[in-house]
């Protein structure tokens, strides 16, 4: 790589990171405005977006209830899907984003790494969501609607790759679900 190529690569990484994190922050801030004043909503939106994208899992919701993470949003698709998307996009990495940007939906042109990452991610998401649903729909998710059960099954599948987000009480998961998480 020449120095110009390295500079271009770094710019793309920083630009892509900023785009994804700020998009997530904007969406989360708009949602948090329903429950918080403007400054807290902006701060929480930015903080949680960066935390999710970097797969850190840190959250500030303990202010509302100790050890709560984002459990108060267990039935909110905007929060759950935005944080899930940020975790997944941050987790698949820059080279996969770049391949997707360069080749669009033309899968034949993807690098082997991109094909493997996307395939493994899809299998894990589908399989994990199905298994969490089967393990928890009559237990932890029993009081939820079918849509909420699927949403939380999906979120339970996405979040083990982070250090701490949860929308349901992980301590109340069945042994099978806990095993699936590891």
For each feature predicted by the language model, list its residue ranges.
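Membrane-proximal intracellular helices of multi-pass ion channels
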Residues: 1-182
């Amino acid at each position: 790589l020449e120095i110009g190529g390295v500079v271009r690569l770094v710019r793309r990484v920083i630009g892509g990171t900023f785009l994804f994190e700020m998009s997530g922050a904007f969406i989360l801030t708009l949602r948090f405005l329903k429950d918080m004043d403007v400054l807290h909503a902006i701060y929480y939106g930015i903080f949680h977006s960066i935390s999710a994208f970097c797969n850190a899992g840190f959250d500030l919701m303990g202010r509302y209830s100790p050890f709560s993470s984002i459990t108060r949003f267990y039935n909110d698709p905007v929060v759950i899907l935005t944080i899930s998307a940020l975790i997944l996009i941050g987790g698949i990495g820059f080279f996969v984003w770049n391949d997707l940007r360069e080749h669009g939906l033309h899968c034949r042109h993807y690098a082997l790494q991109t094909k493997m990452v996307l395939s493994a991610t899809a299998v894990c998401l589908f399989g994990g969501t199905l298994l969490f649903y089967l393990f928890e729909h009559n237990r932890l998710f029993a009081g939820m609607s079918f849509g909420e059960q699927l949403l939380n099954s999906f979120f339970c599948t996405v979040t083990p790759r982070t250090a701490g987000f949860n929308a349901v009480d992980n301590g109340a998961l069945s042994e099978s679900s806990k095993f699936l998480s590891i």
